[in-house]
Amino acid sequence: MTALFTIRALDASNTDFLSHYKGTPYEDSQYRRGAQKIPGVVRCAYYDHGGEGVAYHDADAKNHGSGGLNPANGTYLNEFRMGEGVDISYTKFKLDPQIDDNPFEQVQPPANLLYVGWTEPGEWFNVTVDVAQAGDYTADLLYTSNRGGTISLDVNGEAATGPLTIASTFNASDPLAWRQWHHWSIAPGIAKVRLQAGKSVLTVHILTEGNMNLATLAFRRAK
């Protein structure tokens, strides 16, 4: 069961934070949309440019997904942000044995969806967003977590939620131990945040347990 936390009233414009922030919205040869839009789906793997200590903090400098689990072979997905510390992989379909289209998951994610993985407590990453209209927003998280745990969200450097409980996606029926990291689920309405119109920076913190794969946060206007 996921925990829904009450909106905190923030000065979400926080011009002091934004004026000093050195990160920039993610763009590359295939993604040129700049700041991710809210309402809409925020992709965790498109965290900001800026590097360690600015756009993210990771426990080590090695990307254990791009160029690691997914060998460097010149392809966009296998080498995505390969030189950065945030560990990234992507969903894989139609393989034997099945990986991210397996029968033990609660929802099936899109194929070739990039996600942040190998998470550990204390890690965080920033995503610059462009909010269409000021107001209260609810977020649904697409994720896996073989042990459960907690995350939290900041808006422009200020805490916007308390600890958000991530339910375990462990399924004892799966005979393949490594596939416990590929049981996808959605945490509906895991968080509510109050956002001002225009640019803001969201920070996703890994608080406890880790071993989560974080793919997307889908934001919609709260009812």
Regions found by a protein language model. Name each.
Residues 5-223:
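Extracytoplasmic
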Residues 1-3:
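C-terminal catalytic histidine-bearing segment of alpha/beta-hydrolase fold enzymes
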